[in-house]
């Protein structure tokens, strides 16, 4: 395993944790691929990815092609003579020629129990759908979207309190463990690929800011799941008096009186109670424009005028 020439491809912090695990295990990472530096922050300053920052700290050569379609990018990879490519949240499609370049192929760490939630937002969609569990799948990559043979799975329960942020943290522990286990099996020749059942496939489409706008006609339970799924991005919100108010935390209560969806039933230090299509949502933490996220009790002290009982939110 320690003789394998590994190329790592990844971009966000989730991927950086996997690169760190490879380094901690003293594996031979001969190069890192990550997305080009992007503008970030208020100054729109070009910012390197977490994976690039870690690679530079460890003096690992970094490559940042815009895509892998060019012959130059493909030749650069081939010149590294990789045995294995490990891909974690890289964000670029890999053509077949790239997948065929490493002697042992390319493996991917995916944040779901495949074939469920193939695609861009598996962790968020698992919460959004109310799944009781998710996990990590290590797969041998092919040209399809998360369709490759499965090499290893690890199951992770989803608690009623989990947000996408907290679930990411859990899977960022399981993922590196599963990755190292799989690399060892590949090195030993003991990996047992398992085909995916395409009939059971579901797709985790990207999240959008438009999707994060709360529709009070929907069930309180579904809205509450969206709030957790869209934390930390794009963050659920509702409109009130020309303000977009972000919602960070809520709970579901029964709505026995059956008021109109969107009606403010009461505003108290316990929270902001709003009728929905089924049940009542109590908002516990929200964020006014230009302010920090605060408990509703603190917001109420400053802006009681916004949350008048009987008002109906759009």
From Swiss-Prot:
The UniProt function text for this chain reads: Attaches a formyl group to the free amino group of methionyl-tRNA(fMet). The formyl group appears to play a dual role in the initiator identity of N-formylmethionyl-tRNA by promoting its recognition by IF2 and preventing the misappropriation of this tRNA by the elongation apparatus.
The answer to whether the entry has keyword Transcription regulation is no
HAMAP family, A to Z:
Formyl_trans
Kindly provide the name given to this protein in its UniProt entry: Methionyl-tRNA formyltransferase
State the reactions this protein catalyses. Answer: L-methionyl-tRNA(fMet) + (6R)-10-formyltetrahydrofolate = N-formyl-L-methionyl-tRNA(fMet) + (6S)-5,6,7,8-tetrahydrofolate + H(+)
Gene Ontology CC: cytosol
Can you tell me which residues bind (6S)-5,6,7,8-tetrahydrofolate? 112-115
Q: Which domain of life is it from?
A: Bacteria
What EC number(s) does this enzyme carry? 2.1.2.9
Question: Which residues does UniProt call coiled coil?
Answer: none
Q: Which UniProt keywords apply?
A: Protein biosynthesis, Transferase
Picking any one GO molecular function of the record gives: methionyl-tRNA formyltransferase activity
Family of this protein: Belongs to the Fmt family.
SUPFAM superfamilies attached to this UniProt entry: FMT C-terminal domain-like (SSF50486), Formyltransferase (SSF53328)
The root-end lineage is: Bacteria, Pseudomonadati, Pseudomonadota, Gammaproteobacteria, Aeromonadales
């Amino acid at each position: 395993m320690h003789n394998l020439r590994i190329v790592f491809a990844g971009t966000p912090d989730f991927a950086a944790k996997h690169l760190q695990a490879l380094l901690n295990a003293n594996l031979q990472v001969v190069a890192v691929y990550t997305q080009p530096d992007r503008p970030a922050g208020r100054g729109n300053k070009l910012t390197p990815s977490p994976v690039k920052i870690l690679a530079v700290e460890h003096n690992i050569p970094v490559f940042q092609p815009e895509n892998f379609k060019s012959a130059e990018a493909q030749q650069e990879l081939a010149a590294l003579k990789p045995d294995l490519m490990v891909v974690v949240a890289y964000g670029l499609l890999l053509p077949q020629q790239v997948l065929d370049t490493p002697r042992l192929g390319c493996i991917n760490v995916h944040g779901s129990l495949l074939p469920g939630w193939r695609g861009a937002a598996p962790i968020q969609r698992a919460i959004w759908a109310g799944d009781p569990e998710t996990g990590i799948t290590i797969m041998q990559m092919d040209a399809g979207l998360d369709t490759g043979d499965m090499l290893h799975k690890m199951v992770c329960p989803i608690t009623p309190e989990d947000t996408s942020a907290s679930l990411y943290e859990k899977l960022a522990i399981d993922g590196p463990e599963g990755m190292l286990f799989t690399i060892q099996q590949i090195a030993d020749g003991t990996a047992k690929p398992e085909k995916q059942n395409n009939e059971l496939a579901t797709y985790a489409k990207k999240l959008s800011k438009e999707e994060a706008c709360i529709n009070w006609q929907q069930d309180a339970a579904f809205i509450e799941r969206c709030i957790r799924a869209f934390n930390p991005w794009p963050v659920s919100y509702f409109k009130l008096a020309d303000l977009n108010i972000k919602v960070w935390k809520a709970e579901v209560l029964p709505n026995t009186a059956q008021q109109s969806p969107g009606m403010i039933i009461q505003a108290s230090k316990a929270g902001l109670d709003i009728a929905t299509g089924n049940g009542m949502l109590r908002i516990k933490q929200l964020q006014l424009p230009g302010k920090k996220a605060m408990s509703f009790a603190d917001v109420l002290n400053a802006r009681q005028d916004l949350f008048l009982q009987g008002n109906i939110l759009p």
